[in-house]
């Protein structure tokens, strides 16, 4: 009985850590890029990936949290590099969108990921779902259309970036299912991050130097005036790794259904917390639109489960 209770507390603690790190990194990204005025989303993403590279190595090679899996061929490496590029695009575009959009609206758009996943799965693998599954995507898209039309802080460029980030995130999940589908090439999410993060840094470094000129010099100058920026960047980057770590652990210690429910609720919690902190204006119509999208996502998950 005591072991079961301890296990329950451990799972609750894991879920709380997962929520805190997810919502924390989102809010801190928004604060840095928008409120603090640190307008360098590519450099910020590079900091995240550098932390993920270092901390992944510590967790796997030193702490042995999971067994280390090796890359077995050049083809497998190229597949991981392709995934890493799409992953980079999704994170960078997501961070760019946070400069222009409130977190609440950003999350509403992000909730349309199942729509893009279904589209890419059909276009790339010709995988067709049951008609009922496609029908449940109607409220997902309709909700975002309603939320967009009534969003007081709507910004077209931010909106396009957020849609692109959501589409890239969906594309990565579809490609991952195709590229790493054979038993010999399958990697757990911790090992995949161990290899993807350094490759992402290689992609992001030239992009940062070309598109965000002298960002290192600007950051050093900022640190001289306000050293808090260094702590913000270090904490934010470590938090970005803990999002992945807690996501892996929650997946391992809960069922797929529990994870789905928690994932849907997480977006709603992030919306409420961000509105309370940033006090961005929201409309009743916008919140109804977001609620419709979340309901659509829940129906979509249920329809997919039943069609299996």
Swiss-Prot record:
UniProt keyword annotation of Transmembrane present: yes
Recorded GO CC terms: endoplasmic reticulum; Golgi apparatus; membrane
A Pfam family this chain is assigned to: TPT
Segments crossing the lipid bilayer: 9-29, 42-62, 77-97, 100-120, 130-150, 154-174, 192-212, 229-249, 258-278, 281-301
InterPro entries for the chain: Sugar_P_trans_dom, TPT_transporter
Keywords, ordered alphabetically: Membrane, Sugar transport, Transmembrane, Transmembrane helix, Transport
Subcellular location: Membrane
Main localization (coarse): membrane
Membrane topology: Multi-pass membrane protein
Ranges for domain EamA: 29-147
Family: Belongs to the TPT transporter family. TPT (TC 2.A.7.9) subfamily.
Name of this chain's protein: Probable sugar phosphate/phosphate translocator At3g11320
Organism: Arabidopsis thaliana
Biological classification of the source: Eukaryota, Viridiplantae, Streptophyta, Embryophyta, Tracheophyta
